[in-house]
Structure formats: C-alpha cells, structure tokens
C-alpha cells in the first residue's frame, strides 16, 4: 500500500516562541508505503519479506538554554523545525513446519528486522535532552528466532 498526502495547517502554527511558525503539519510524511510478500518454495518452508517506507517529515527540536547546556551533555541551541531523512525498514522471516500426527505442527522460525539499520542517528542525550525528538523506526537491526506449536 502507498499513501501520498500533503498535510498543512490553514494558518501557520506557532509551536515555539523563538521558532518561525510552520504551515506544514509535524510528523506527517507526504509519502508512506508498505509491502509484504510470502514465498513457499516447498510445502513446509515459508519465506516472508516485509518493508515499510516512511518519507521525510518535519519534526520539532526544542531549544536548550545555556543554563541547561552547562548542566547536561547537549550544547546550547535554538528551537528549530527540521526535515528528517526518509527511512526504509526491511525485514525477512523464514519458517519451517514439522508435522506430527495428523493435526500437530511444530514450527521453527528466524529472521531479521530492520536489515538496513534504518534508524535515527541524532538522538539527544543526557538529563536535558528533548525527549520528544524521536522519529523513524523504533528499533535498530535485530535478529529473532522462535518456536510455534499448533494443534
């Protein structure tokens, strides 16, 4: 599926006293898409591929005052609205079914989520960080394995 949109305020939105007002809505990419594909090369083996594309979007980054910068790990900076990079999050899963008796299936599966390590690179750190400055996929590349029993 694909979503193409353009989200704007009727009047510019003043989100911070020191930052310019914005007509673009925050955290709403103009382009978003996803897909899933499943391939079964032999009856007990299934391979699934899934992906999500999130286009660039406008996000708010709060100011850090000189006083707060002196107490934490982040440098002083003004409030600013930034365009994020776009992200493509791809995952793969392989599953193999072992049949026991007539109605019992034991499945082994494994896979990788976020294969390309599409992940925010500029997190704020420390006690005075902007905890709302988060965008993009929620987890870095991860590996998983599982067992499923159906009866």
Annotated model-derived regions:
Residues 44, 53-67, 96-151:
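C-terminal beta-signal and adjacent terminal beta-strands/loops
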Residues 67-75:
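Charged, glycine/proline-rich intrinsically disordered loops and linkers
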Residues 15-24, 77-82, 130-135:
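Extracellular loop and loop/strand-boundary signature of outer-membrane beta-barrel proteins
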Residues 26, 38, 81-83, 99, ...:
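Residues embedded in well-ordered secondary-structure elements
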Residues 29-33, 86-90, 104, 139-143:
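Residues that define the transmembrane beta-barrel architecture of outer-membrane proteins
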Residues 79-89, 101, 151:
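Outer-membrane beta-barrel transmembrane domain signature
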Residues 1-66, 119:
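Gram-negative outer-membrane beta-barrel transporters
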């Amino acid at each position: 599926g694909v979503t193409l949109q353009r989200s704007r305020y009727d009047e510019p939105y003043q989100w911070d006293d020191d930052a310019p007002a914005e007509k673009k809505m925050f955290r709403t990419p103009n382009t978003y898409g996803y897909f899933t594909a499943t391939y079964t090369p032999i009856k007990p083996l299934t391979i699934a591929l899934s992906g999500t594309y999130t286009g660039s979007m406008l996000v708010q980054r709060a100011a850090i005052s000189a006083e707060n910068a002196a107490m934490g790990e982040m440098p002083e900076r003004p409030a600013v609205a930034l365009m994020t990079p776009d992200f493509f999050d791809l995952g793969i899963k392989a599953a193999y079914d072992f049949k026991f008796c007539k109605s019992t299936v034991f499945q082994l599966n494994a896979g990788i989520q976020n294969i390309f390590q599409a992940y925010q690179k500029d997190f704020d750190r420390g006690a005075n960080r902007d905890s709302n400055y988060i965008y993009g996929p929620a987890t870095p590349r991860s590996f998983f394995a599982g067992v499923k029993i159906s009866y």
